[in-house]
């Protein structure tokens, strides 16, 4: 059992004057056959298995550290032993979204390193200890670059890490380092000692309500193991429902939004394009980049010039959670290939799935990239309700008597890790911005290179949406956008997943959302997201017959006349339809505001208008597209 003293998060130590090791791309690391990487993989797998086997009542167990994210809503690393913690620690829809998760990743990384050190001390033979110790000190928790395509010229599909799809994995045996051993893979899933709803109070995991009107719940309490797309209402195999990696990969590439008819079209993956835009935009402030939180005077809809502040890191993050885990517990007949629900799609239990840690490491990496390119933005232009940079990031301790703050978390290198994309080779300093931009283009620039037609000025089209993530009292839902064409078909443009959970009430305190969510609902705080249309319209020219250049008047007319949207519940019901605005309960959706806009794109080009890969596009002066009344 761990000590009751505060657990101080310092990161993996680095000797003075030494180069700080980098967190590596997990697929590149897994495929690296060098001796050091093979040892690192082996000690990582061994340590993660040990971590997951620690008694769930131990503060430093995998179970309790994963539970910080939400369920089981107990205190962690506070003065008293774990007790029910109705306030929770949630920071979603909040400007501290990236900074709160930074020490969270550090905590996980540090715990694994501590277990590695113990394993080397107690298990590895003396003749191999130094080699394994050196490899462990160079190890850092890898990241999953969810927007990096595979194949030549980055044109292949997106996919989960290879390691996440292996039920078993072969490593070097720490007790006999020259001998391979095959073990159940702890990155594949987490398995609790019993059904999570049967664990002793206050550690038990409850079900999660997914329907505001009916008693439909995600049965997390009946799960012993995490799953991806494994839970279906009429499927009795809940305890260990499996990892349908094929569905996760399909969702990452097809983006399985609700489709009101089955007139399909080839999958169009837009995640890579959105990440490139995120890192290209000149946001007005840190908060605009960091969070979906939408606060302005009286929550008015965004003016066109604010369009560049609607896209955010958190919006992209929310959708990927949905695609990796799956939300279709009831089974939507319009998408049979993507039925099923899993832990990653749910705020309360996402962190129990081991892929969560690889995934959020990449969210931290994207934050670091943006920080290097935007060093003049840090909690600037705050709204009065925004968290301050010196507010505590509970429950993480930076010292025995002080919680982390965002200011503490701002500079990542002092915690013993770095990322290659932002690190000047051979130093502990930033790369030059031009070199970072070149790497962004190499990793995520393929869609934008297809869009650039060698013209001095081209155009960008977007949908901006302001929504209330608590409209269903926190129960998650999706807003899906379409072009409803003259032939009656609906062409899907994209969507927004709220990644939220039901707020608690007096009768249901153990299952509900946190204080942050309740306070935001009470204050009327909204959320925002942006659906980029340019790449979709370019790749789907057969929808509009306008050609590749997407002339402004004609393109705006199509958006104005044919854009529509539906709000879809996790139970697959249509909760709001812009073409039938009186359907359902209009009052619930009165704050939902959809606007469209266009702007010029100025590409970084030479005198022959050839794209310069050391620059990023500039998006200028958005103007409104006035939508036709429904």
Swiss-Prot record:
Cofactor: Cu(2+)
Cofactor note: Binds 2 copper ions per subunit.
Alphabetized PROSITE patterns for the sequence: TYROSINASE_1 (PS00497), TYROSINASE_2 (PS00498)
EC supergroup of this enzyme: oxidoreductase
Positions annotated to bind Cu cation A: 69, 92, 101
Keyword Transcription: no
InterPro entries for this protein: Di-copper_centre_dom_sf (IPR008922), Monophenol_mOase_fun (IPR016216), Tyrosinase/Hemocyanin (IPR050316), Tyrosinase_C (IPR041640), Tyrosinase_Cu-bd (IPR002227)
Keyword tags: Copper, Melanin biosynthesis, Metal-binding, Monooxygenase, Oxidoreductase, Thioether bond
Catalysed reactions, semicolon-separated: 2 L-dopa + O2 = 2 L-dopaquinone + 2 H2O; L-tyrosine + O2 = L-dopaquinone + H2O
Residues involved in Cu cation B binding: 317, 321, 360
GO molecular function terms attached to this record: metal ion binding; tyrosinase activity
Cross-link 2'-(S-cysteinyl)-histidine (Cys-His), sequence positions: 90-92
Domain of life where this protein originates: Eukaryota
An individual GO BP term: melanin biosynthetic process
EC number: 1.14.18.1
Similarity comment: family membership: Belongs to the tyrosinase family.
Function: This is a copper-containing oxidase that functions in the formation of pigments such as melanins and other polyphenolic compounds.
Protein name as annotated: Tyrosinase
Organism lineage string: Eukaryota, Fungi, Dikarya, Ascomycota, Pezizomycotina
């Amino acid at each position: 059992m761990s000590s009751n003293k505060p657990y101080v998060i310092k990161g993996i130590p680095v000797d003075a004057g030494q180069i700080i090791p980098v967190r590596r791309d997990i697929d590149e690391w897994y495929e690296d056959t060098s001796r050091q990487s093979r040892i690192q993989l082996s000690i990582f797998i061994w340590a993660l298995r040990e971590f997951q086997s620690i008694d769930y009542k131990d503060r430093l167990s995998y179970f309790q550290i994963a539970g910080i994210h939400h369920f089981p809503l107990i205190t962690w690393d506070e003065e008293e032993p774990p007790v029910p913690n109705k306030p929770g620690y949630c920071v979603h829809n909040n400007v501290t979204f990236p900074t709160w998760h930074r020490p969270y990743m550090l905590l996980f990384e540090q715990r694994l390193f501590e277990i590695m050190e113990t394993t080397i001390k107690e298990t590895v033979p003396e003749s191999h200890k130094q080699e394994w110790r050196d490899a462990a000190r160079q190890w850092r928790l890898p990241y999953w670059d969810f927007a990096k395509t595979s194949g030549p010229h980055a044109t292949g599909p997106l996919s989960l890490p290879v390691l996440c799809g292996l039920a078993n994995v072969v490593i070097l045996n720490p007790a006999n380092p020259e001998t391979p051993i095959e073990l159940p893979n702890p990155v594949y899933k987490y398995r609790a000692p019993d059904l999570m709803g049967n664990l002793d109070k206050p550690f038990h995991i409850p079900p999660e309500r997914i329907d505001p009107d009916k008693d439909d719940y995600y049965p997390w309490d009946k799960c012993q193991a995490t799953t991806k797309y494994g839970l279906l209402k009429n499927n009795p195999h809940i305890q260990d429902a499996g990892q349908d990696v094929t569905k996760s990969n399909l969702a990452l590439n097809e983006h399985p939004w609700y489709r009101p008819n089955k007139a399909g079209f080839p999958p169009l993956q837009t995640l890579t394009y959105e990440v490139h835009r995120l890192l290209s935009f000149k946001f007005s402030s840190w908060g605009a980049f960091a969070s979906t939180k939408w606060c302005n005077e009286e929550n008015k809809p965004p003016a066109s010039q604010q369009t560049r502040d609607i896209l955010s890191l958190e919006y992209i993050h929310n959708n990927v959670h949905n695609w990796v885990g799956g939300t279709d517990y009831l089974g939507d007949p319009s998408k049979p290939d993507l039925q099923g629900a899993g832990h990653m799609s749910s705020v309360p239990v996402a962190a129990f799935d081991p892929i969560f840690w690889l995934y959020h490491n990449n969210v931290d990496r994207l934050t670091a990239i943006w920080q290097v390119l935007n060093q003049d933005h840090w909690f600037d232009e705050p709204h009065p309700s925004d968290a301050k940079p010196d507010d505590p990031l509970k429950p993480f301790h930076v010292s025995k008597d002080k919680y982390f703050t965002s200011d503490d978390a701002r500079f990542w290198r002092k915690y013993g890790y770095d990322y290659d994309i932002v690190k000047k080779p051979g130093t502990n300093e930033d790369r030059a911005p031009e070199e970072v931009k070149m790497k962004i283009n190499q990793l995520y620039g393929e869609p934008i290179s297809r869009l650039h037609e060698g013209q001095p000025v081209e155009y960008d089209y977007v949908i901006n949406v302001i929504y209330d993530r608590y409209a269903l009292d926190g129960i998650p839902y999706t807003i899906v956008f379409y072009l409803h064409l003259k032939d009656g078909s609906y062409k899907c443009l994209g969507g927004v997943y709220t990644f939220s959970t039901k707020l608690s009430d007096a009768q249901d305190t153990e299952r509900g959302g946190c204080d942050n969510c309740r306070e935001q609902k009470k204050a009327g705080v909204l959320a925002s997201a942006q659906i980029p249309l340019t790449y979709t319209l370019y790749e789907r020219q057969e929808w509009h017959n306008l050609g590749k250049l997407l002339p402004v008047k004609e393109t705006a007319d199509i958006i104005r006349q044919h854009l529509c949207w539906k709000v879809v519940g996790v139970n697959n019901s249509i909760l709001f339809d812009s073409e039938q605005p009186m359907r359902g309960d209009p009052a619930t959706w009165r704050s939902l505001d959809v606007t469209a806009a266009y702007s010029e794109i100025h590409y970084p080009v030479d005198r022959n208008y050839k794209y310069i890969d050391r620059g990023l596009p500039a998006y200028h002066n958005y103007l409104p597209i006035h939508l036709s009344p429904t």
